[in-house]
Amino acid sequence: MALLQISEPGLSAAPHQRRLAAGIDLGTTNSLVATVRSGQAETLADHEGRHLLPSVVHYQQQGHSVGYDARTNAALDTANTISSVKRLMGRSLADIQQRYPHLPYQFQASENGLPMIETAAGLLNPVRVSADILKALAARATEALAGELDGVVITVPAYFDDAQRQGTKDAARLAGLHVLRLLNEPTAAAIAYGLDSGQEGVIAVYDLGGGTFDISILRLSRGVFEVLATGGDSALGGDDFDHLLADYIREQAGIPDRSDNRVQRELLDAAIAAKIALSYADSVTVNVAGWQGEISREQFNELIAPLVKRTLLACRRALKDAGVEADEVLEVVMVGGSTRVPLVRERVGEFFGRPPLTSIDPDKVVAIGAAIQADILVGNKPDSEMLLLDVIPLSLGLETMGGLVEKVIPRNTTIPVARAQDFTTFKDGQTAMSIHVMQGERELVQDCRSLARFALRGIPALPAGGAHIRVTFQVDADGLLSVTAMEKSTGVEASIQVKPSYGLTDSEIASMIKDSMSYAEQDVKARMLAEQKVEAARVLESLHGALAADAALLSAAERQVIDDAAAHLSEVAQGDDVDAIEQAIKNVDKQTQDFAARRMDQSVRRALKGHSVDEV
């Protein structure tokens, strides 16, 4: 397996000259910015000493505010205060309305179906909102470092798809930032812990943030970080704990009107405060909307237990994908503020059979890892031997004849990666080829996900199988896919970059993987049948062309035998008997052997006509 050296040519800094770089943890609930100073990675605080920046933006006609100031307006001006925008990244409006029906914002759809949020500052998309958060973080870094940033590394959940990753990059560019790389959040945490403590072996990174959950199984060895498998849920996090507790408080308080956005915000604020308090106390008193009551940690644990169980199921799947057992995991790294919840730490410890690591602040560990990576990529550590491997979550491939999927890059392949396969034409004189890019684990197109289509035109008109088309799949370090098709004799090519308008949920990814295992035997049989049908069609197509050109080489009796064999093959190819189709193909081959030999002799005679033996 190839390893990726994380240092780019041309970026090495001059002696005694350091470039300014930052790592940004663009979180659902809170965001942070970190940098490396005097050889140590540290998060940067605001003027009041606060390291976290709430991922909240409040919009007004004359401007906007970000962070704590914006969050104070959430209850007063809910419609213009955008929070948890990370959940909206790369999703269509229909998808958002289905997933998050209780959002207090008014939406409109853009021409391509993407969401536009109605605010006092006008219609804004999630990319713009994210850009405003990034600008605030960049301003903090610029002031702390007394200079403009040369580049940033921004972290994203491991399960972010192409559209979500591209949206993050677009937001950074809109904020005026040079993106060195997008980095998976669990991988960033592994960098922070791997470099600080020099561990080797298999570790699990359990990342439960405000809005997303990721589990990564990594192997650390001599500065090499290899992601063995990933899993998670992009719609599960501490926010869900908050909403469950808010609903519980609402029921206890007898507050019926859920549509009152202001009351809902007060309930949510009370729930957040109670959750934090219950991490350190056995019970907490809650005051909201004129109601006062007490909530115990036991009650809170009962509410969130099903969600914690969901995270552990994802852990089990990731371990299976990685091919390791829980007792092989040497350490468990806890990432994200929600891992402070005692029940989470307790259940994770029980699952892996060891207390999880919490020596680095779980809120800061991702930003610290991103800062270390940014410092290397910007050229401040040209001698670094650190390597980093990420993986793709689902296999990538192409549709081939018969509705089959030919996998080009298997799932859990490390990225960046480039793989190529050669394909050919099916029919005589074929001058174009449709390239259908697929994603999934099943054998048939109907059971996989369509990513993109494009056409390669200008193929030389040759007999079937005469043209050779090389299709190259390239996944870059940010997980974005480019597909290029090139006809090898002419050099004509076409390509596409996959940027779906919205992506799969993590539960859908898990379901696709599960289905591939459940239907493995059935899929293999279906593939064998489809392949035989394609071969039958190819044989009949070739035979039809040969008869049209050289039927005169056959006697009437010989022609009848061949026609009967072809008719039988055509008939059985409509059925589902793989063996019968295979035998019928062999019979056609047998009955046409003499015909093929005569055609070859005739071609040779034509080629030699008019030439002497000496010329040959």
Swiss-Prot record:
<dbReference type="Pfam" id="PF00012">
    <property type="entry name" value="HSP70"/>
</dbReference>
<keyword id="KW-0547">Nucleotide-binding</keyword>
<keyword id="KW-0143">Chaperone</keyword>
<dbReference type="GO" id="GO:0005524">
    <property type="term" value="F:ATP binding"/>
</dbReference>
<dbReference type="InterPro" id="IPR018181">
    <property type="entry name" value="Heat_shock_70_CS"/>
</dbReference>
<dbReference type="GO" id="GO:0016226">
    <property type="term" value="P:iron-sulfur cluster assembly"/>
</dbReference>
<protein>
    <recommendedName>
        <fullName>Chaperone protein HscA</fullName>
    </recommendedName>
</protein>
<dbReference type="InterPro" id="IPR013126">
    <property type="entry name" value="Hsp_70_fam"/>
</dbReference>
<keyword id="KW-0067">ATP-binding</keyword>
<comment type="similarity">
    <text>Belongs to the heat shock protein 70 family.</text>
</comment>
<comment type="function">
    <text>Chaperone involved in the maturation of iron-sulfur cluster-containing proteins. Has a low intrinsic ATPase activity which is markedly stimulated by HscB. Involved in the maturation of IscU.</text>
</comment>
<dbReference type="GO" id="GO:0016887">
    <property type="term" value="F:ATP hydrolysis activity"/>
</dbReference>
<dbReference type="InterPro" id="IPR042039">
    <property type="entry name" value="HscA_NBD"/>
</dbReference>
<dbReference type="InterPro" id="IPR043129">
    <property type="entry name" value="ATPase_NBD"/>
</dbReference>
<dbReference type="InterPro" id="IPR029048">
    <property type="entry name" value="HSP70_C_sf"/>
</dbReference>
<dbReference type="GO" id="GO:0051082">
    <property type="term" value="F:unfolded protein binding"/>
</dbReference>
<dbReference type="InterPro" id="IPR010236">
    <property type="entry name" value="ISC_FeS_clus_asmbl_HscA"/>
</dbReference>
<dbReference type="InterPro" id="IPR029047">
    <property type="entry name" value="HSP70_peptide-bd_sf"/>
</dbReference>
<dbReference type="GO" id="GO:0140662">
    <property type="term" value="F:ATP-dependent protein folding chaperone"/>
</dbReference>
